[in-house]
Regions:
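Short secondary-structure transition hinges
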Residues: 123-162, 180, 201-204, 208
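Helix-turn-helix
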Residues: 38, 42, 46-80, 84
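Hydrophobic alpha-helical connector segments
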Residues: 84, 98-128, 181-185
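N-terminal intrinsically disordered/low-complexity leader segments
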Residues: 1-34
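Hydrophobic/aromatic-rich alpha-helical bundle segments in the mid-to-C-terminal region
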Residues: 14, 144-146, 168-215
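Amphipathic alpha-helical linker/stalk segments
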Residues: 85-113, 143-150, 156, 163-166
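Generic hydrophobic, amphipathic alpha-helix propensity
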Residues: 32-43, 60, 85-97, 160
Length: 224
């Protein structure tokens, strides 16, 4: 009985020690992730308002009231920080697109909803969109890094491509050039999103009407 009691106490102490050790570690991880997000948010805002070329790591550090050394603990250089900002945008977009794909079995309907979601995403997160799609981050990162294999950017593009490919396989479109059609759909959505974001004072018609019309014109023109 004493052995059983001893083993029980020992087990409880081990569990307590593990929980005690795990608690501070988990807290540190949360704090680390929170600070990383603060850095990303500050960098995104500065890149939009002042231009990537004009923003230094020290400028970002000043904004969040930390030393530049702290930022370098999270990001190797400014290009790595820009890439992380873009990846965050693509990750948000990819998650939205995945949700749409799961809820629809009709590839054409999925494509329509995806195009609308793309534009709506840009309007909901204009700073994310500006940095990632309008301010030419590829010029600073290099095309091979901006759209490198395994990146969230390529994941988003691959989702769109797979959707268009399914429309072609089911003979829903009369054209079969997969790459051209994928790029066309992206260009259409980007055109509307970027103009609505960068030209807010233009006398646009109702935004929903404009988005729906763009989608209908593109897809109806492709239907078999």
């Amino acid at each position: 009985d004493n052995v059983v009691v001893y083993l029980t106490v020992l087990t409880d102490m081990t569990t307590l020690n593990t929980q005690t050790t795990r608690g501070p570690k988990q807290r540190r991880e949360r704090e680390k992730e929170a600070l990383r997000q603060v850095i990303l948010d500050a960098a995104r805002e500065l890149f939009v308002n002042e231009g990537y070329e004009n923003v230094s790591m020290r400028r970002i550090a000043d904004k969040i009231e930390y030393s530049p050394t702290t930022i370098y603990l999270y990001f190797e250089d400014k290009a790595a920080l820009l890439f992380a900002v873009c990846e965050e945008t693509f990750a948000k977009l990819a998650k939205r697109m995945e949700s749409i794909s799961r809820k629809s079995t009709d590839p054409v309907e999925t494509l329509k909803r995806g195009c609308r979601a793309y534009v709506e995403f840009g309007l909901k997160y204009p700073n994310h969109y500006r940095v990632t799609f309008i301010n030419h981050p590829d010029l600073h990162l290099g095309r091979e890094n901006y759209l490198r294999e395994g990146s969230m950017g390529m994941k988003c593009y691959s989702q769109l491509r797979a959707n268009v490919e399914e429309c072609i396989k089911q003979k829903r479109f009369r054209h079969g050039d997969l790459e051209a059609l994928t790029q066309l759909m992206w260009a259409g959505g980007h055109g509307v999103a970027s103009l609505l974001i960068t030209k807010p004072d233009f006398p646009w018609v109702n935004k929903d009407k404009l988005i729906d019309l763009m989608i209908d014109v593109l897809i109806d023109g492709l239907k078999a």
